[in-house]
A protein has these predicted regions:
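Active-site hotspot residues in diverse enzymes, especially metal/ion-binding acidic/histidine motifs
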Residues: 1-191
């Protein structure tokens, strides 16, 4: 896997925070379809309806007639669909798309664009500051609270271990605002 330099990582992380704020996400698990419903130029399609995905693709995004169209493989488990949709939102919000050039989500592609979209999806679905406040740092806790796969939760738990050891939360103003936006949820669900 190609490592993602820190600048690109921060850009993806910050974009996920901005998405959380812009679309008023304030509880876990994040309902990614609500983000799409609130957006003016993003449409969501099930592959079982449009048959656009190739073998091995979990999702893709194309720009068509001024709309970003996300197609996802709806036969996969719901937590996988949510990650795929979030990943595709990452491509959109990070500006990865060119006119009429699709971006695909597969298991094989591991370049910087895909890594950035994965960071965006991870940070959207499992925001570290919220997990920190909930004291949810194990893969099991994260998978349950965030409705993500155990594989994704393990990756998040590994990153949480690093973040907890560093203990540098709330240095960025966007992160502080995300924490404030989740305040009621945190109070209701603190371990």
């Amino acid at each position: 896997m190609i490592s993602l330099d820190y600048g690109k990582y921060k850009n993806a992380r910050n974009a996920s925070w901005q998405c959380i704020l812009d679309f008023n996400v304030n509880k876990l698990p994040v309902i990614v379809t609500d983000i799409i419903k609130k957006s003016e130029n993003i449409r969501l399609f099930k592959d079982s309806d449009v048959h656009m995905l190739e073998e091995g693709e979990s999702g893709k995004t194309i720009l068509h007639n001024g709309f970003f169209e996300i197609v996802y493989r709806d036969t996969e488990p719901s937590y996988r669909c949510r990650f795929t949709i979030s990943h595709e939102l990452g491509h959109i919000f990070l500006g990865h798309l060119l006119i009429n050039t699709p971006v695909y989500r597969t298991f094989a592609i591991r370049d910087d664009l895909e890594s950035s979209a994965n960071v965006f999806a991870r940070d959207l679905l499992a925001p570290a500051c919220v997990l920190h406040e909930l004291q949810a740092t194990t893969a099991e806790q994260i998978a349950k609270i965030c409705n993500i796969s155990m594989q994704a939760a393990k990756h998040r738990a590994e990153r949480m271990h690093v973040l907890e050891a560093r203990n540098k939360y709330y240095l960025h103003p966007l992160e502080r605002r995300v924490r404030e936006q989740f305040d009621s949820f945190i109070k209701e669900n603190k371990q």
